[in-house]
């Protein structure tokens, strides 16, 4: 079986898992590209990315250019003379000069069934939209944003209680083996690339903290999906005022949908050991696991034990 010389480009833990799979394979990782070290923690000390840490453990040369558009960075990469470049959540734009360097091109592992959910947050957007299925796509990169020709897909069902955390874990199970499968057949021409249909595409924009606020004027089903999509970050939330008039921001980690009632959206219908039930535009959202500021996530009953006055029945949030 042909052993390929690979440049790996990636930054977060998701990418490091793929690098580990390559290191465990018969292929040869000859260089690693990752984002420059960034300040982290209270001390703002420079911290290496998970990919860099793993590469250094295996004595693989690490390159951290701020940009790949400069001639110096491109010539440095050209000298490595790799067969293929594997890109997983790298974070830098690859110009055409770089894309054309390896003889087998640049492969990208993307966390959706392209062309659906191109962009930075495919896992979260798929859950929020109510998709029943997602997966991973391995593609040949071009200069567009996740627009390259597709080589291989693996499908994955989205469970009714799926969170971004659990779906991420599912995709992490299927993605590295799929990457190795493609690499093993790439040099033999086993994979016929398929162009993406732009008409079928949609964009998975990066999540923002502003989007995390719950809007009671949409359906309970949409809100429940919102909560699962925004778990573990940035976490869905709503605000209420305490008896002193202070605003209390409450994060929500888990909720359930109940049948419709004819009440103004945002009205607290009940607050007891079974949850905090809020009327929405369609249906009732039963809040089950919440987190007030400065506390750990807790069941609704535990929050009500200490803060029942925040949730009087009939109050409109």
Curated annotation (Swiss-Prot):
Gene Ontology MF terms in the entry: methionyl-tRNA formyltransferase activity
The record's listing under PROSITE patterns reads: GART
Q: Which residues form a coiled coil?
A: none
EC no.? 2.1.2.9
Matching entries from InterPro entries are given as: Fmt, Formyl_trans_C, Formyl_trans_C_sf, Formyl_transf_N, Formyl_transf_N_sf, Formyl_transferase-like_C_sf, GART_AS, Met-tRNA-FMT_C
**SUPFAM superfamilies for the chain:** FMT C-terminal domain-like, Formyltransferase
Quickly give the catalysed reaction: L-methionyl-tRNA(fMet) + (6R)-10-formyltetrahydrofolate = N-formyl-L-methionyl-tRNA(fMet) + (6S)-5,6,7,8-tetrahydrofolate + H(+)
Identify one Gene Ontology CC term for this UniProt entry.
cytosol
The record's top EC class is transferase
Question: Quick one: which residues bind (6S)-5,6,7,8-tetrahydrofolate?
Answer: 112-115
Arranged from A to Z, the UniProt key words for this protein are: Protein biosynthesis, Transferase
Q: Into which family does the record put it? A: Belongs to the Fmt family.
> What does the record give as the function of this protein?
Attaches a formyl group to the free amino group of methionyl-tRNA(fMet). The formyl group appears to play a dual role in the initiator identity of N-formylmethionyl-tRNA by promoting its recognition by IF2 and preventing the misappropriation of this tRNA by the elongation apparatus.
Q: What is this protein called?
A: Methionyl-tRNA formyltransferase
Q: Which organism is it from?
A: Pasteurella multocida (strain Pm70)
User: What is the gene name?
Assistant: fmt
């Amino acid at each position: 079986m042909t052993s390929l010389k690979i440049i790996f480009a990636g930054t977060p833990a998701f990418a490091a898992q793929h690098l580990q799979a390559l290191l465990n394979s018969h292929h040869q990782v000859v260089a690693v590209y990752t984002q420059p070290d960034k300040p982290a923690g209270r001390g703002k000390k420079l911290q290496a990315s998970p990919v860099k840490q793993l590469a250094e453990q295996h004595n693989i040369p690490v390159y951290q250019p701020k940009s790949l558009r400069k001639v110096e960075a491109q010539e440095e990469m050209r000298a490595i003379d790799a067969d293929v470049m594997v890109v997983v959540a790298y974070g830098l734009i690859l110009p055409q000069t770089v894309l054309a360097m390896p003889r087998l091109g640049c492969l990208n592992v993307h966390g959706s069934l392209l062309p659906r959910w191109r962009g930075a947050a495919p896992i979260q957007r798929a859950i929020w939209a109510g998709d029943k299925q997602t997966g991973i796509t391995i593609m040949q990169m071009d200069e567009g944003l996740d627009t390259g020709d597709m080589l291989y897909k693996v499908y994955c069902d989205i469970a009714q209680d799926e969170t971004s955390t659990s779906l991420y874990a599912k995709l992490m199970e299927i993605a590295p083996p799929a990457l190795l499968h493609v690499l093993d057949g790439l040099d033999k021409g086993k994979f016929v690339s398929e162009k993406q249909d732009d008409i079928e595409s949609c964009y998975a924009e990066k999540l923002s903290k502003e989007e995390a606020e719950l809007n009671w004027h949409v359906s309970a089903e949409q809100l429940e999906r919102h909560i699962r999509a925004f778990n573990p970050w940035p976490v869905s939330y709503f605000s209420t005022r305490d008896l002193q008039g202070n605003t209390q921001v409450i994060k929500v980690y888990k909720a359930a949908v109940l049948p419709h009632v004819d009440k103004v959206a945002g009205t607290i219908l009940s607050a007891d050991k079974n949850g905090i039930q809020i009327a929405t535009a369609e249906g009732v959202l039963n809040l089950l696991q919440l987190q007030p500021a400065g506390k750990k996530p807790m069941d609704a009953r535990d929050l009500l034990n200490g803060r029942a006055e925040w949730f009087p029945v009939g109050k409109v949030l």
